[in-house]
């Protein structure tokens, strides 16, 4: 009996029953219980002394603190976001648009994100979703964009060109994100054969090895017209050295040899067609159109009269990537357009020449200076010359778009005659 009562007392103490009974006696004023207290004080005292109540309170506090701590940790982690090339360009979007505008193109933020995160990734050339400033990845994407015919993407040319501009001429905020330069691959040096020691013998003398006679570079006939144009210095002529001539004598050189000699003597005056691409030591170099380029562009694209939009997009991509000179623009127009189409394009372009107020002007001197019909003296090595060419290419594109909007040919409409069995509808 005593053991059962002790177990009951232990359970009562565990769940606070004894304290509740004691407080109840205090509340009803039992004898020896002391002064009576208010119900709120009694309930607080019961909750404080009960272990189960304290456990409930701890659980409630923990359920409140855990979400708060989780939220604070998540905010801290989100505040430390990783910067990617794409997010970097979006943070400096005004500078990216200015860079594209200097190249004569326009880019839009939404399409910039779509191309970087989806379109170029789906090309399967190694382009990451977060973007990159690696020239290898940019070149792989350019191969897909500049593919001839229907496989290309002329509308994406301004965007990949701006990416390349940021990678080749990076601003200060791009330099820390450029990939490290690749170490130059050095080819292993060929192993030179060790000279074998001469055989010594007491019976036979050692004779030195004589080199085999080398064949003459030039034919033995001095009057032969063949000339070695691949060597910098003239090769030795067969025969002995004769006495010098008594008087100065100027030999008559062929046109090819004279041109090569002038190129070696005057490298600075090599070409007047000024360069459009940067070569070694940041010096521009001139890259003219090849005959195969012009042939491929003409054969893989519809004529201007059939699809002016497609041909205009092609010419726009060529102007942006090659940045041709005035002469190259004329060569491009002659290869891709007919004579009538060229005249219409040039006429529409001259209508768009801006004046001092930015609106199209009708002053002949300003039009001839900005969009000349004869070869101008624009020096691409100077900022003024490059600005002239940039504006000329923009006006040429405006002329192509204006010529594409042709009016209705009423003469062809009049040629349509209703047949005898056709209804007026």
UniProtKB/Swiss-Prot annotation:
Residues 177-196, 213-223, 233-248 have a biased composition (Pro residues). Its main location: host cell. Disulfide bonds: none annotated. Glycans are attached at residue 137. It is a single-pass membrane protein. One of its GO terms (biological process) is virion assembly. The chain crosses the membrane at residues 55-75. Residues 174-285 are annotated as: Disordered. It is found in: Host cell membrane. This is Glyco-Gag protein.
